[in-house]
């Protein structure tokens, strides 16, 4: 089991998942990538090494970490995936952020990068990359999504799940960040239920 954290997270979060996968070795991936083109190299190299040492490899990935994994890995490197609040359509998210920041495509193309007041820097290079590199994903996948996720809409995640034959579970009242006791209990139950299914 390889755990991939979200923004601001750490590989140490993998410890939490050890009790949920008692028969497996669980390790956290302490990646450095900030963009999908960096992740393409770093993730594929790391997972290739892990794959050479193990017959089966399962991915557990969170938020932006899930997006990097979706953008850089394939069924040759991963046998199964559990995605928690994944960013599955980065183009849509960037376009939403542009609206929040009142930035047009023309402005972004001219300035290349624009800092926002909500802590994100909009990048023309990033937007162009995700448009030119759509996600191709053929790994058996379970997705956990919070009803009130503020980064990805239910329509977007549902469309992704349908297109990629992923099993989607929606937590009523859930958020993008699963962190309360109730949310973590829901996550635990979701992982155990998905683990019982055979692909």
Predicted segments with their positions:
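Short, surface-exposed "cap/lid" segments of acyl-processing enzymes
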Residues: 1-34
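Short, surface-exposed alpha-helical segments at coil->helix boundaries
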Residues: 11-18, 37-40, 154-158
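Catalytic nucleophile-loop/oxyanion-hole region of alpha/beta-hydrolase
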Residues: 28-51
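Aromatic pocket-lining residues of Rossmann-like dinucleotide-binding sites
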Residues: 72-73
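The alpha/beta-hydrolase serine catalytic core
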Residues: 77-159, 163-170, 174-199
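Short hydrophobic segments within beta-strands
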Residues: 2-7, 60, 84, 144
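Short coil/turn segments at beta-strand junctions that form active-site/ligand-binding loops
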Residues: 24, 54-57, 79, 139-140
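Gly/Ala-rich beta-loop-alpha elbow adjacent to hydrolase catalytic centers
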Residues: 60-69
